[in-house]
Amino acid sequence: MPQNEYIEQHIKQHGRRLDHEERKRKKEAREGHRIAKDAQTLKGWRAKQFAKKRYSEKVAMKKKIKAHQESKVNGPATPKEDDGEALPTYLLDRQTNNTAKAISSSIKQKRLEKADKFSVPLPKVRGISEEEMFKVIKTGKSKHKSWKRMITKHTFVGEGFTRRPVKMERIIRPAALRQKKANVTHPELGVTVFLPILGVKKNPQSPMYTQLGVLTKGTIIEVNVSELGLVTAGGKVVWGKYAQITNEPDRDGCVNAVLLV
């Protein structure tokens, strides 16, 4: 035996520790914590080498996952119809056509139908800058502090909304610019109803504006449609549906929206 294989020789002669498997399992479980700690604490050249190594590992993992997914979609190779080869007995009960491609195409079709179902009347809207959205509020004894902002657009706040203490409130939503109801038009029925707003689902400008409940053109809101008497296929009354704002609420003074059917 070569001289450099003394460890393997010792293992063959005396075996391993009784708790070897348990220690190995625990070490592998701690590996994620060690990697996270190294990523946060390493500095300089060692940090660059570590980041390069992690990047290559992640790229290899993504390639492996992608290849695995493609193999699942494509499935095993099927024999050609015109080659004339006889199938073995244990393969006679299998279907010759590959159903994975059919499943994949049906999933894509469902995605297209879903996208068409939730297509909005206004797919593109004008961007709004922060200077237009926020107004700087000067505070302090000598009015030199400028960390507060006041929203100049209409907003929606919930029923149980309470303002934060004055010295901790960074963004102010004026009570005069708060909206609770919207003029919602049903595109198929052709009627306009004054419905209460339940919440802001998506503001196309920024996720922060969605969290603040800012109502701008193109915003998706949820409205209470129980007054319309809409029911599902199971006979249940529809409570809330999405609608898209089609006007500029800060210019018109009201919220006009189209129901997404």
Curated annotation (Swiss-Prot):
In this chain, the stretch annotated as Disordered covers 1-36, 62-84
Q: Where is this motif: Nuclear localization signal 2?
A: 51-58
Q: Which domain of life is it from?
A: Eukaryota
Q: Name a biological process GO annotation.
A: maturation of LSU-rRNA from tricistronic rRNA transcript (SSU-rRNA, 5.8S rRNA, LSU-rRNA)
Q: Where in the cell is it found?
A: Nucleus, Nucleolus
| Presence of the UniProt keyword rRNA processing in the record | yes
Biased composition annotated in UniProt, kind: Basic and acidic residues: 7-36
Q: Do the record's keywords include rRNA processing?
A: yes
Question: What's one GO-annotated cellular component?
Answer: preribosome, large subunit precursor
**Where's the motif Nuclear localization signal 1?**
15-22
A Pfam family per the record: Ribosomal_S8e
InterPro entries the record matches: NSA2_fam, Ribosomal_Se8/biogenesis_NSA2
Per UniProt, the keywords (alphabetical) are: Nucleus, Ribonucleoprotein, Ribosome biogenesis, rRNA processing
Tell me which positions the record assigns to the signal sequence.
none
Which PANTHER family does this UniProt record tie to the protein?
A: RIBOSOME BIOGENESIS PROTEIN NSA2 HOMOLOG (PTHR12642)
Family according to the record: Belongs to the eukaryotic ribosomal protein eS8 family. Ribosome biogenesis protein NSA2 subfamily.
Q: What does this protein do?
A: Involved in the biogenesis of the 60S ribosomal subunit. May play a part in the quality control of pre-60S particles.
* Complex and partners: Component of the pre-66S ribosomal particle. Interacts with NOP7 and RRP1. Interacts with RSA4 (via WD repeats).
Official protein name in the record: Ribosome biogenesis protein NSA2
What is the protein's species of origin? Scheffersomyces stipitis (strain ATCC 58785 / CBS 6054 / NBRC 10063 / NRRL Y-11545)
Give the taxonomic lineage as stored in the record: Eukaryota, Fungi, Dikarya, Ascomycota, Saccharomycotina
